[in-house]
Amino acid sequence: MVYSYTEKKRIRKDFGKRPQVLDIPYLLSIQLDSFQKFIEQDPEGQYGLEAAFRSVFPIKSYSGNSELQYVSYRLGEPVFDVKECQIRGVTFSAPLRVKLRLVIYEREAPEGTVKDIKEQEVYMGEIPLMTDNGTFVINGTERVIVSQLHRSPGVFFDSDKGKTHSSGKVLYNARIIPYRGSWLDFEFDPKDNLFVRIDRRRKLPATIILRALGYSTEQILDLFFDKIVYEINGNKLQMDLVPERLRGETASFDIEANGKVYIEKGRRITARHIRQLEKDGIERIEVPVEYIAGKVLSKDYIDESTGELIGAANMELSLDLLAKLSQSGHKRIETLFTNDLDHGAYMSETVRVDPSNDRLSALVEIYRMMRPGEPPTREAAETLFENLFFSEDRYDLSAVGRMKFNRSLLRDEIEGSGILSKDDIIEVMKKLIDIRNGKGEVDDIDHLGNRRIRSVGEMAENQFRVGLVRVERAVKERLSLGDLDTLMPQDMINAKPISAAVKEFFGSSQLSQFMDQNNPLSEITHKRRISALGPGGLTRERAGFEVRDVHPTHYGRVCPIETPEGPNIGLINSLSVYAQTNEYGFLETPYRRVRDNVVTDEIHYLSAIEEGNFVIAQANTNLDEEGRFIDELVTCRNKGESSLFSRDQVEYMDVSTQQVVSVGASLIPFLEHDDANRALMGANMQRQAVPTLRADKPLVGTGMERAVAVDSGVTAVAKRGGTVQYVDASRIVIRVNDDEMYPGEAGIDIYNLTKYTRSNQNTCISQMPCVSLGEPVERGDVLADGPSTDLGELALGQNMRVAFMPWNGYNFEDSILVSERVVQEDRFTTIHIQELACVSRDTKLGPEEITADIPNVGEAALSKLDESGIVYIGAEVTGGDILVGKVTPKGETQLTPEEKLLRAIFGEKASDVKDSSLRVPNGVSGTIIDVQVFTRDGVEKDKRALEIEEMQLKQAKKDLTEELQILEAGLFARIHAVLVSGGVEADKLDKLPRERWLELGLTDEDKQNQLEQLAEQYDELKHEFEKKLEAKRRKITQGDDLAPGVLKIVKVYLAVKRQIQPGDKMAGRHGNKGVISKINPIEDMPYDENGTPVDIVLNPLGVPSRMNIGQILETHLGMAAKGIGEKINAMLKQHEEVTKLREFIQRAYDLGDDVRQKVDLSTFSDEEVMRLAENLKKGMPIATPVFDGAKEKEIKELLQMGGIPTSGQITLYDGRTGEKFERQVTVGYMYMLKLNHLVDDKMHARSTGSYSLVTQQPLGGKAQFGGQRFGEMEVWALEAYGAAYTLQEMLTVKSDDVNGRTKMYKNIVDGNHQMEPGMPESFNVLLKEIRSLGINIELEEE
């Protein structure tokens, strides 16, 4: 493998054995591709905005005299970029402008004669844009639209599995689900009649639908039944015989023909009898006349002479009726063929219960069911029925729905109309009847072939269409009002309903979620999440076990591990690593094609439906050099089952061992040794890890860390290769390689880094460069690390030296004992940034004012404010400190005569205002790192706002000037090269000022042209610079668009540094979580023979019952990795020769059986080997991919190489006594995470505070500064102890005895420690409630 200069800095040793056939795809493509499809112009008009416009336009007036046509649309440029939107709290969006054409036709002239055409571009609201990382910025916060897994449109056949009816009879049903429109259900009842429901309303006999479609009884029977023809010969009756129809019946008479008895009376007819009849070619037999009684006529029989109806279709034959038919000259009688086995008489029975007998009565019946209480007219009934399933405006199966519909009915074509046809309805009924008859299977609803993914683009398109349809109605009415000659398209369209629909979707839809931004992994996982909830999906309460369960079709598509614990389990899933959606929205996963027993590198993506037909081998099947299967029998999957197949039968093979799991689960090393429940917790807890101060790459990883860090977008990644020309904490400049430059550009890429920004979860986002000046970089290299990344690898926690042993009960019940060294070295110190906002509004009594002049506040409290009343940057503040001084005018109060006198003497008018300053919340302390002031247009800016503005302008100018200088330098370097090659002497050139170089003339025409081109570029650069500077200045100085009634907003950013402390929650990656019980002095921790103390002591009893053995293997492998690091460190300290170092490191990389990774250090320069060694001295990072990881033997070899006992256990000594522990202890390195459940956020204590209004009891909860509830069970405890006074105190003065608690406060102030309980307020509430029932209760005073 070829490594770039940056990748050579630290190479992770990979224990994977299987070759990597397919690279990990871009992990955010599901979001980005979907949205791209939505906004890009689609000439076919199948997707996105184009499809929405085409489905609604043209809008014709009711009279047909005019129409509004759609021509095209374009998206403008967003006003603010993403960062500005986040700071200002606005939506990152672009204006949508649509070109519309108003066509007016001549009234009296022939159809289609155009009178006037007007074309105009119309503004149709703002469309939120997706950022490069797959998120949306809505009102300044980053949000993610989660993809939805919903039931695909189409037809589904299902049964109630015998749960509906008490008899346990299985009732079958069919449901036609459109993409939009009414649902159509067919279902059997326990009496085997077929019923229909529209939109889940009351059921009607299914034949009503057929009658409404215009079918008569005769035609209905003709559609669903085979016929038996009887001929009357004198007094004999002959029947046409189809032998196959007799199977399973019992002969009720001798079946004979040509004098030979084939089946005797009372015998069961078997397949042998049928073969005999077929062989002899028997087509007719004579039957006794009684046999026909009870059979059903298939058509109407009329007496030709009188025209009288003798026998109607679907009428049961009796001997009398037979005689009548015979007399009226009907010699051939057709009856329906039915039997109890596989040709039920369901439709015939249904016709009997059908109240309607012609089309009109059927339509009326449907109208009554859909619109109860409205009087039906013929037109209304016809229109309603027509609109239900046969109107393109109201009903759409969609391409997916039609494809699934046709596939289900085994039709050949997969395309067709979006509305239903007669044939569609009849074929669904036929198939349902076949299933009831025992032919065919019901569908599996949880099969991923029946559930599809709806991503951002599609959902946004649907919302947009909803908005357009609202506008359509208004436009139709506008077109019909006349005076069109003066109107333009602009006057027709009101953009409000459209932008409201879009805004509602992005702002408050159940699937538009506040992005989980704890760390890069949680961002990526959130964007790859798939939810079965949401509009048009399931609800938590109704979802049963089947929907939540893992289904065989999830393999390689949806992760079986990563799902939340709790009520949403199984409803919210994560996309597997390699999964993607196909054009219809079904999930597909890649497989390698197997041809002639050889596994090729040809990759096919198969959906769940296609996969069912193939035999697929697992990724860890043994292959030889050529890719042939070594074993005769191979474990494969086929039709959802796993079993052994011969190697000749295999058609596909998995692409990778990681294919099954999601990104989160693929980051757990030795996942294959963990119990699934613990793996689930492990995958979920990685998402809650807080980024530490210094990220530390995991010693034991899985090789997925780099992909996650790069794709998450938190790192700065090189767009093009080149050389690092400049680097500081906030900017990296790359001079691009000549071969990657675009013609006519300066060839400089500038990367501005994000510094100390707040994330959605209040963690800190900051980027740090990881390249140095002059280094070569290639496209895709990581230039700067973001939060939780280390040299371009995901680093969620820290590598800690752990020992599994009990320690004085401090690790009881999963508690964790931590060494003080961890705190001293700031290993788990995290930075949290809070945003506090102060809003100044215009009130009825006058505007609120932000000022440092606050009534009744001492000097000390104002010491951290400037003259505008806003806190300084860098001030250290604690709970209760004022951050922004604000006063609110309060109404004139009635003054007492004394106050009036005082006012008159001291002339004090200041108390007309009350203090409403922004203060630091209780229990929070930190440093102010930034202040932003937003002022409404037209409101005078205060001094601080102007200072901030000036600072921003300076910064912007500095940035742009530096950018210009960098670009100029690049350009002049090229001009210099052209002039020198054109014959100008270099030293003379250097004496001239650079600007004069452009005036020089060259004799060589080519060179002169190049020089002129470069001169043009230089002018363009300067012009561009002026333009950018002006735009920036305008943006910074313009007023802000604030909500109505808001004059000013001051946002203060507070950074809090949190060290690890008892009560914080920590976890490993295997679901092994615990709470810190004690931070122990270093000298008391157990230490080894070299005197190295351990960092963390874990409870060994947490392992066996939980069956997450992965943590033990990780510990051993971590120890080995550290051992090798220490050996390298020792060699570096002794200044060993590079050859020795190279040889040792090479040996380490080569260790293992048949590993796929080949690192050849002989191609590395000495300097590169030294730098690699520097980066490996703290431990050699190791990758052990999921299901393809390091074997026990390899771990032992690595331990041996690191000079550690192969048991992985060492002797420890007690730090307090220095005595040896009795047995050896497992010690190693485990990757530990600090989770975002910090004790600082949970700790809470109340002295006095607010009370509830009605009950007068203290409020509850930390947010309200509430008290602890002393509940029913706690009262029982005090009663059981007989602690009467304590109980009285709890129920009165400490709770809701208002007078008692005020008296008690007075007593305490007076130093008199006594209490007199009074009447609890809740008792008064009870009295009032009883009185409200009309029962008077009076308390007797003693």
From Swiss-Prot:
Q: Per its UniProt record, what Pfam families does this chain match?
A: RNA_pol_Rpb2_1, RNA_pol_Rpb2_2, RNA_pol_Rpb2_3, RNA_pol_Rpb2_45, RNA_pol_Rpb2_6, RNA_pol_Rpb2_7
Extract the GO molecular function terms from the UniProt entry: DNA binding; DNA-directed RNA polymerase activity; ribonucleoside binding
Instruction: State the EC number(s).
Output: 2.7.7.6
Top-level EC class: transferase
Q: Which GO terms describe its cellular component?
A: DNA-directed RNA polymerase complex
Q: Name one GO biological process term.
A: DNA-templated transcription
Q: Where are the transmembrane segments?
A: none
Question: InterPro entries, alphabetically?
Answer: DNA-dir_RNA_pol_bsu_ext_1_sf (IPR042107), DNA-dir_RNA_pol_bsu_external_1 (IPR019462), DNA-dir_RNA_pol_su2 (IPR015712), DNA-dir_RNAP_su2_dom (IPR007120), DNA-dir_RNAP_su2_hyb_sf (IPR037033), RNA_pol_bsu_bac (IPR010243), RNA_pol_bsu_CS (IPR007121), RNA_pol_bsu_protrusion (IPR007644)
Q: List the disulfide bonds.
A: none
Mind telling me which Gene3D superfamilies this protein's record contains? 2.40.50.100, 2.40.50.150, 3.90.1100.10, 6.10.140.1670, DNA-directed RNA polymerase, beta subunit, external 1 domain, DNA-directed RNA polymerase, subunit 2, domain 6, RNA polymerase alpha subunit dimerisation domain, RNA polymerase Rpb2, domain 2
The record ties this protein, via CDD domains, to: RNA_pol_B_RPB2 (cd00653)
Reaction catalyzed: RNA(n) + a ribonucleoside 5'-triphosphate = RNA(n+1) + diphosphate
Q: What keywords sit in the KW lines?
A: DNA-directed RNA polymerase, Nucleotidyltransferase, Transcription, Transferase
Q: Which PANTHER family match?
A: DNA-DIRECTED RNA POLYMERASE I SUBUNIT 2
Subunit info here reads: The RNAP catalytic core consists of 2 alpha, 1 beta, 1 beta' and 1 omega subunit. When a sigma factor is associated with the core the holoenzyme is formed, which can initiate transcription.
Q: What does this protein do?
A: DNA-dependent RNA polymerase catalyzes the transcription of DNA into RNA using the four ribonucleoside triphosphates as substrates.
Describe the family membership recorded for this protein in Swiss-Prot or TrEMBL.
Belongs to the RNA polymerase beta chain family.
- What is this protein called in UniProt? DNA-directed RNA polymerase subunit beta
- The organism is Pectobacterium carotovorum subsp. carotovorum (strain PC1)
